[in-house]
Amino acid sequence: MRQDAGLASIHNNELNTGRQISALLKKDLLLETRQQHTFYGILLYIASTIFVIYLTLEDPDASTWNAIFWITQLFICINAVAKSFLQEAKGRMLYYYTITSPVSFILSKLAYNAVLMIAMSIINLLVYTAMLGNPTSNYISFCMIGILGGCGLGLIFTMLAAIASKALQQASLMAILGFPLILPQLMMLVRLSKTAFGEIFNNGIPLQMIALLLAFDLLMIILSVILFPFLWKD
């Protein structure tokens, strides 16, 4: 009987966590639709950044095209994801503290920002291709890598934004914490993207890099779930 009660309790907790995540995701979507100036601001940032690159380079070679795409992707992620915690007022966070668990809260933020960055990656890629051309030999492959990279960057900066939101110098702290985490991932994404330009790798190398990127994303989720409850109590 005790075992059955324990299993029922676990099942109920899982249901509650799922409902909390769903409700928090709906809340973030509702805020995004009500505060459309933020979304349009990011779109303007994408268009203006790529337009400046177009005016400067016009017809970049494949290596430059690839490198600048990921640099653009990085700064888009900083602008899009950093606000997820910075816009939350202290009173609102106190309210969340009373109605949801820290795990549900951080998982909802991770999921929302991952989806947001997938959308931003697609938009960035379309605008980038329209203005700077398409030197890739396998555009679909590059799109998939871009989506994978955007999702991973979103997960990293969600965790960093959660940590930085508890500090005074939030932007500086995000830059300091983010550099050692972002650099290896960006280097791997740039290298993996070269497969879409026709560069030949040894058998299994691209799959190994994809597996490493997915493992890194999973590590970010696990670390967020472990560390965020301590920030939640602060």
Regions found by a protein language model. Give the residues of each.
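A structural motif at transmembrane helix-loop-helix junctions in multipass membrane proteins
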Residues: I147-F179, W232-D234
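Hydrophobic alpha-helical transmembrane segments of multi-pass membrane transport/permease proteins
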Residues: Q36-E58, I68-C77, L177-M188, F216-L223
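Membrane-interfacial helix-loop-helix connectors in multipass membrane proteins
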Residues: T56-P60, L126-I145, S193-I210
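Selective transmembrane-helix segments that form parts of the transport pathway or gating/packing helices
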Residues: P102-T129
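Transmembrane helix boundary and interhelical loop/hinge segments in multi-pass membrane proteins
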Residues: E32-T33, I78-Y96
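Junction motif at the cytosolic side of a transmembrane helix
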Residues: A130, D217-D234
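Transmembrane alpha-helical segments of integral membrane proteins
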Residues: G152-M159, Q185-E199
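Aromatic- and glycine-rich beta-strand/loop motifs that create alpha-glucan
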Residues: I10-G41
